[in-house]
UniProtKB/Swiss-Prot annotation:
Gene3D superfamilies assigned to the protein according to its UniProt record, in alphabetical order: 1.10.8.60, P-loop containing nucleotide triphosphate hydrolases, Winged helix-like DNA-binding domain superfamily/Winged helix DNA-binding domain
One Gene Ontology molecular-function label: four-way junction helicase activity
Pfam families given in the database record: AAA_lid_4, RuvB_C, RuvB_N
Function, as annotated: The RuvA-RuvB-RuvC complex processes Holliday junction (HJ) DNA during genetic recombination and DNA repair, while the RuvA-RuvB complex plays an important role in the rescue of blocked DNA replication forks via replication fork reversal (RFR). RuvA specifically binds to HJ cruciform DNA, conferring on it an open structure. The RuvB hexamer acts as an ATP-dependent pump, pulling dsDNA into and through the RuvAB complex. RuvB forms 2 homohexamers on either side of HJ DNA bound by 1 or 2 RuvA tetramers; 4 subunits per hexamer contact DNA at a time.
EC number: 3.6.4.-
UniProt record similarity statement: Belongs to the RuvB family.
UniProt protein name: Holliday junction branch migration complex subunit RuvB
Chain segments carrying region Small ATPAse domain (RuvB-S): 198-268
Biological processes per GO annotation: DNA recombination; DNA repair
Positions with a binding annotation for Mg(2+): 82
UniProt keyword list: ATP-binding, Cytoplasm, DNA damage, DNA recombination, DNA repair, DNA-binding, Hydrolase, Nucleotide-binding
PANTHER family xrefs: HOLLIDAY JUNCTION BRANCH MIGRATION COMPLEX SUBUNIT RUVB, PTHR42848
Chain spans, region Head domain (RuvB-H): 271-354
Length: 354
């Protein structure tokens, strides 16, 4: 199988604002992501522990002809929460209905989805932490008893009726598990945290995507893309497409180590997978705030970025790689951050260097 990208023309589409962002950049990119998305566990790479658990739970549900327990997937953006929801539905052999927390503004929005589910279907709610309290209240009896209460009529004549639902599985995805209310979190029978991918795992993903995109690539070129992708498949696939463009225009079309290095340098992606925004954040903490501790609001104002974007997209990888520390008093730059920027660390005055 191969994917022809003629149908994904970038004409009249806004450019990707930040190539290393783990958030989907545009409907155009989302369309390509869907085309590259694995549909079954046999095609899925990484998250070995989560995959093993889900395969067992799905197999048991199919054996008993029951709906799978409700599933909560959480972790940084771009790690495959949406992909896993599609795989769960495909492996169960059922329909998938997809929505997001911000879209479900009123109880009737959720009720319309729930009443149209068939037996054992999967309902995927992305950004489930952003459900409004009134919608969340409707969800509780649906998750526990497969029933919802809806109001008929208005004013004094209004009355509540109970509707039975088909058994279904809710798959909720969030980058902020801590923002879920306890009652909602407790209703998920399966909770799985997605971790950043290794360079080897991303290398396998890049090779698979290159094959689907008909992009000739050698092993060294593919691994260089993978190793700079911040442990995130979405970023790996985005970098692959940009390097392929460079190879087509500046080379022979073959993605080699040399082509990958030149293309990534053009994109301002350094060997650690950091881009301009990562370096701006580290430079701000070190130069403007003496290495920290500094609060997130001050960092956001300093680099001109949204607080939520810093917390959800930029800093998780910096923390995971040991360049930034999150403390009760604020963010602190580590020795690795000073070395990466070629800045001499302070001799004294910072707790982490004592």
């Amino acid at each position: 199988m191969s994917i022809q990208t003629d149908d994904f023309s970038a004409a009249d589409l806004p450019p990707v604002k930040r190539v290393m962002s783990a958030a989907p950049a545009s409907p155009h990119e989302e369309a390509i992501e869907r085309a590259l998305r694995p549909k079954l566990f046999d095609e899925y790479v990484g998250q070995a522990k989560v995959r093993e658990q889900l395969e067992i739970f799905i197999g048991a549900a199919k054996k008993r002809s029951e709906a799978l327990d409700h599933v909560l997937l959480f972790g940084p953006p771009g790690l495959g929460k949406t992909t896993l929801s599609h795989i769960i539905a495909h492996e169960l052999g059922v329909n998938l209905r997809q929505t997001s927390g911000p879209v479900l503004e009123k109880p009737k929005d959720l009720a319309a989805l729930l009443t149209n589910l068939e037996k054992n279907d999967v309902l995927f709610i992305d950004e489930i932490h952003r459900l409004s309290p009134v919608v969340e209240e409707i969800l509780y009896p649906a998750l526990e008893d497969y029933q919802i209460d809806i109001m008929i009529g208005e004013g004094p004549a209004a009355r509540s009726i109970k509707l039975d639902l088909q058994p279904f599985t809710l798959v909720g995805a969030t980058t902020r598990a801590g923002m879920l209310t306890n009652p909602l979190r407790d209703r998920f029978g399966i909770v799985a945290r997605l971790e950043f991918y290794t360079a080897e795992e991303l290398g396998r993903i890049v090779r698979r995507s290159a094959s689907l995109l008909n992009a000739p690539m050698d092993e060294e070129g593919g691994f260089e893309i993978a190793r700079r992708s911040r442990g995130t498949p979405r970023i790996a696939n985005r970098l692959l497409r940009r390097v392929r463009d460079y190879a087509d225009v500046k080379g022979t079309g073959q993605i080699t180590l040399d082509i990958a290095n030149k293309a990534l340098a053009m994109l301002d992606v350094d060997p650690q997978g950091f881009d301009v925004m990562d370096r701006k954040l580290l430079e701000a903490v070190i130069h403007r705030f003496d290495g920290g501790p500094v609060g997130l609001d001050n960092i956001a104002a300093s680099i001109g970025e949204e607080r939520d974007t810093i917390e959800d997209v930029i800093e998780p990888y910096l923390i995971q790689q040991g360049y930034l520390q999150r403390t009760p008093r604020g963010r602190i730059a580590t020795l690795a951050a000073y070395r990466h920027l070629g800045v001499a660390p302070p001799v004294s005055g910072n707790d982490m260097f004592t």
